[in-house]
A protein has these predicted regions:
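Long, contiguous binding/interaction regions
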Residues: 8, 14-65, 69-86, 91-169
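Mobile "lid/hinge" segments at catalytic clefts and subdomain interfaces of large enzymes
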Residues: 1-7
């Protein structure tokens, strides 16, 4: 799907940085701790991917998305908490959908919902009809699950069903 970036009422241009590093000689617990520290220090997203390095050594590729001003603090954490000896840095432009978070009443209680508007596009032409996508926020669903004892999938399905029914009204 091609979305008209700058100037669109539905999407905006953004700049984000990607920090990457290969990490071996570590434990899953250490990687989990590093992820927690990076997210607490401002990382927008953190992920690990399994990779093989030279001499077929298994390792992890650490990928961190962040704003430019957060790079020094995040690199300091990566160097202090991992066995890496280098960090790659890439500046990336991206298009992101505009979104809003609403608190919606449901039969299970109030749920925070992220709403995105996705224009139907054909090349550079943006049509008037727009798809509305709703994503219940994790913390809201988790709180309902803890309170009711129901599964995450069950609660999410019910919330989405109620959102769709209310949209039709």
């Amino acid at each position: 799907m091609l979305i008209r970036p700058a100037g669109s009422e539905y999407a905006a241009q953004d700049v984000i940085y990607k920090l990457e590093s290969n990490i071996d000689d570590t434990t899953g617990e250490a990687l989990g701790y590093v992820m927690e520290r990076l997210l607490a220090a401002g990382a927008r997203d953190v992920q690990y991917s399994p990779v093989y390095m030279k001499k077929n050594r298994p390792a992890y590729l650490l990928t961190v998305l962040c704003l430019e001003e957060d790079i020094p603090a995040l690199e300091e954490i990566i160097f202090a908490e991992t066995t890496t000896i280098g960090i790659r840095r890439v500046r990336m432009e991206r298009s992101i959908l505009k979104r809003h978070i609403y608190t919606i009443p449901t039969s299970l209680g109030d749920v925070e919902v992220k709403m995105c508007l996705v224009p139907h596009c054909n090349g550079n032409e943006v049509f008037e009809d727009v798809e509305e996508r709703c994503y219940p926020e994790y913390e809201s669903i988790k709180a309902i699950c803890k309170r009711t004892g129901r599964s995450y999938q069950d609660v999410t399905r019910q919330v989405l069903r109620e959102l769709a029914e209310n949209k039709e009204d």
